[in-house]
UniProtKB/Swiss-Prot annotation:
A motif (DEAD box) lies at residues 227-230. This is ATP-dependent RNA helicase dbp5. It catalyses: ATP + H2O = ADP + phosphate + H(+). One of its GO terms (biological process) is tRNA export from nucleus. ATP binds at S120, Q121, S122, G123, T124, G125, K126, T127.
């Protein structure tokens, strides 16, 4: 990788050289933590702290001025929200809108409702923004309406769907009659006779099946949200399912797409899925998560990768760690070998049953399992506050059969490393490189995000340990841990 030192104050400098830790004896006060987002704090979610970035707004009404004060808000009280929703925000430690919420909420809450395509970094409040919009549009004035689906949120995985349900439960805890339903694959295939709830959160295939079987009535839906929209619209199968679900919904439904990344081709697709939408975007150079020390290790071959991981085990358990691999088979093999050698690890892939997946992620959130081996099923949206390290055991890549050169998957890399260093904390991401092709893919990532990824010499494990421990200690000190 590039050997030049980044200029002081540059993006690369901020990422590869996190600030010195705050004194452990001076933990942050609640007032200094305006929000939690991703998972609610009650679920072990992370506090929201924002880096310096600019939110760009493009209005569907080209004659309107996006800088008009009407399209920005500084206080939740200025939005005319139900006092019970404000009470829920207060219970979640929401003191003022995040930067993305300042611009998104006036656009989301306007009447008549307009579509929105929103791009924002992980941990900047996008989950709370679309949940707030949904809660403000619900009519819970009768028992019948409370049991009638009025809002639908689609997520790519059951883990993210369950996390979103938790946010709705906490934010909407003071709304009488709020009923939330989850539409994710059932282990036994058993389904309820009818979805009697006001908000449905689920995965596209299950939702489509429920609507077709009339388990879920869709004709009263007012809002459709796609979280991690780029993943669902770009992924074969999920994109088709999303389109089919939308075709079954009322034509005047408000469509909201939120994600941390929108590649150009997906953005074009999203514009068709949510026509005449207001847009909120960031430049991709601004998307690399600030506060994550990005490192890479040279490994001679696949076996050396595994031995390197074993050597890192003691550091992996300082906080919590996620190890990302390419395939389910790799996850199972690594787990099997590490457990046989006496290490405590867990794995989570799309190949295991839903209830078992739920149990694994719940144990990880609670800290009972500190090292989690997974595929890209957990790369997006999942917020666990204790994660201090992410390992890219395999560099994320776009599979292009017949291609002469392997292509790094920039968006997946961003989402993966975003599982640590969330909301102002300092985290570590380590990528394993075992051949020239993997090194070139990491180089592609560095160029795309205009950042620096630092090489660590695995011949000197004392140095490796010192660098990583110092960064993790910095993260814990910022949280006031002792």
């Amino acid at each position: 990788m590039a050997s030049e030192q980044p200029e002081a104050g540059s993006l690369a400098d901020r990422i590869t050289k996190p600030e010195e830790p705050a004194p452990a004896e001076a933990p942050e006060q609640t007032e200094d933590i305006p929000q939690t987002d991703g998972a609610a704090a009650q679920q072990g979610g992370s506090d929201l702290h924002e880096p310096d970035y600019t939110v760009e707004v493009k209005l569907s009404d080209l004659q309107a001025d996006p800088n008009n004060p009407l399209f920005s808000v500084k206080n939740f009280e200025d939005l005319g929200l139900d006092p019970r929703i404000l009470q829920g925000l207060s219970a979640m430690n929401f003191r003022k809108p995040s930067k993305i919420q300042e611009r998104a909420l006036p656009l989301l809450l306007g009447n008549p409702a307009k579509n929105l395509v929103g791009q924002s970094q992980s941990g900047t409040g996008k989950t709370a923004a679309f949940v707030l919009n949904i809660l403000s549009r619900l009519d819970l004035s009768s028992e019948q309406l409370q049991k009638t689906p009025q809002a639908l949120i689609l997520a790519p995985t059951r883990e993210l769907a369950r996390q979103i349900v938790g946010v709705i439960q906490v934010m909407g805890q003071f709304l009488d009659g709020l009923v939330i339903g989850t539409a994710v694959p059932a282990d036994t295939g058993a389904r309820p006779a009818k979805m009697e709830c006001s908000v449905v959160v689920g995965t596209p295939g299950t939702v489509m099946d429920m609507i077709k079987r009339r388990i879920m009535i869709a004709n009263k839906l007012r809002v459709l949200v796609l979280d991690e929209a780029d993943n669902m619209l770009d992924q074969q199968g999920l994109g088709d399912q999303c389109i089919r679900v939308k075709a079954l919904l009322p034509r005047d439904i408000q469509v909201v797409l939120f994600s941390a990344t929108f590649p150009a081709h997906v953005h074009e697709y999203a514009s068709k899925f949510a026509p005449q939408a207001n847009e909120i975007t960031l430049q991709h150079e601004e998307l690399t998560v600030e506060g994550i020390k990005q490192l890479y290790l040279d490994c001679s071959n696949d076996e050396d990768k595994y031995q390197t991981l074993v050597n890192l085990y003691g550091l992996l358990t300082v906080g919590s760690s996620i190890i990302f691999v390419k395939t389910r088979a790799s996850a199972q093999e690594i787990e099997k070998r590490m457990v046989a050698e006496g290490h405590t690890v867990a794995s989570l892939t799309g190949g295991i049953e839903g209830s078992q997946r739920d149990a694994v992620i719940d144990q990880f959130r609670a800290g009972h399992a500190k090292v989690l081996i997974t595929t890209n099923v957990l790369a997006r949206g999942i917020d666990v506050s204790t994660v201090s390290m992410v390992i890219n055991y395999d560099i994320p890549e776009i599979h292009q059969p017949g291609a002469r050169q392997r292509q790094a998957d920039f968006q997946t890399y961003l989402h993966r490393i975003g599982r640590t260093g969330r909301f102002g904390r300092v985290g570590v991401s380590i990528s394993f490189v075992s051949n020239r092709e993997e090194w070139e893919m990491l180089n592609q990532i560095q160029r795309y995000f205009n950042t620096n990824i630092q090489r660590i010499d695995t011949k000197d494990w004392d140095e490796v340990e010192e660098i990583i421990k110092k960064t993790i200690k910095s993260s814990r000190a910022q949280l006031g841990f002792r």
